Amino acid sequence: MNDSILEPKHRGNVREIAAIDLGSNSFHMIVARIVNGSIQVLSRLKQKVKLAEGLDENAVLNQEAITRGVNCLALFAERLQGFPMENVNVVGTYTLRRAVNNDEFLRQAAKVFPYPINIISGQTEAKTIYAGVCHTQPEKGRKLVIDIGGGSTEMIIGDDFTPLMAESRHMGCVSFATQFFTDGIISPENFQRARQSAVNKIEDLGLEYRKLGWQSVLGSSGTIKTVAQVIATNLDPNGTITAERLNALIEQTLQAKHFTELNINGLNQDRVDVFVPGLAILSAVFDVFHIQQMRYSDGALREGVIYSLEKNFQVADIRASTA
C-alpha cells in the first residue's frame, strides 16, 4: 500500500475516509476518497486475526487473541496517521459483542489505536452489510443477502436499498471450526452435526423469509467468496453457486479426513482451516431458504460502513471509480 495516498486531503470537495471492520476471522480496512459526492476506493488492507478462536465457553476472549487484534490495529493506526476522528469509522462484530471482557480488548487497543471502536449489534451489522452489498452491485428489486462471517451469519431481505428483514445468528466459520471440527478432523458425522446445528439456528426464519420472496440472492464475505472461487475454477467461470454445485463440492470435500488434506483447485491456503465449517453453514442456508442460486458480492460490512460515513455519494460510482 502506498502510504502517501492516505494523507487526508481537503482540497475543494475532496475528503478521504476510512472504514474498519473488526471481524471474527479477519480485520479489514478500506480507505476511500469522496470527490464531489462520489466514492473512489483507494486501498484495502486485510489481516487474518482469528479473534473468535480466542473465545472460550464462558465467552472470555484470551490474551493471545487480544494481542493479535491489538497488533493489527497498531498497523492500521500507522496507515491512518493524520486522519481526523470524524473521517474514520471502526466497527466490532460478533466476537467483540460476545466477549464478556471486551472492555479489556478496548483498553489495550486504545494504547496503540486512537480512534473509537463501536461494537455494533447483530441487527445493525446485518443492515450495514445490506447497504454495502446494495451499493456495490447492479441488482435491482428485492434481494436476499447472506453473509457468513467468522462468528456470525447475517440474513437480510430488502427492496433496492431498504432492508425489510435483517437477522444475525451465532454461527460462523471460525466458531464452527472450533465446535465441530476439533483439531481439523473432517468426517461426514462432524459435517452433518455442524450443518444440523446451523439449520436449527435459522429454521425459524425460513417460512417468513420465503413468504417475502426475492428476485436475486447475493452472498458476501470470505466463505461465500471462497466457494464461488472454487466453483469458478472447476465448474462455472461465472462462479455462480447452485444447490447442485454446492452438494458436489461437499461430496468432494468429505473425501478428505483433515483440513490439511483439502486439495481443491481454487481453494486458497489461508481459508483451509475455515472452509469446511463455512460450507456446512452455507449448505444449511441453501436448504432452509430453498435457494436455487447465489452470486458472490464483493461489497459487505466495510463498504456499508464507508457508505454510513458519506451518505450522499452517487451509488454507481463505487463500482465505476474503484481505483
From Swiss-Prot:
Enzyme Commission (EC) number: 3.6.1.11
Reactions catalysed, as given in the entry: [phosphate](n) + H2O = [phosphate](n-1) + phosphate + H(+)
GO cellular component, one term: plasma membrane
Gene Ontology process terms (BP): polyphosphate catabolic process
Molecular-function GO term, any one: exopolyphosphatase activity
Membrane disposition: Peripheral membrane protein
SUPFAM superfamilies: Actin-like ATPase domain (SSF53067)
Enzyme class: hydrolase
NCBIfam families assigned to the protein according to its UniProt record, in alphabetical order: exo_poly_only
Main function: Degradation of inorganic polyphosphates (polyP). Releases orthophosphate processively from the ends of the polyP chain.
Subunit organization: Homodimer.
Protein name, entry field: Putative exopolyphosphatase
Upper taxonomic lineage: Bacteria, Pseudomonadati, Pseudomonadota, Gammaproteobacteria, Pasteurellales
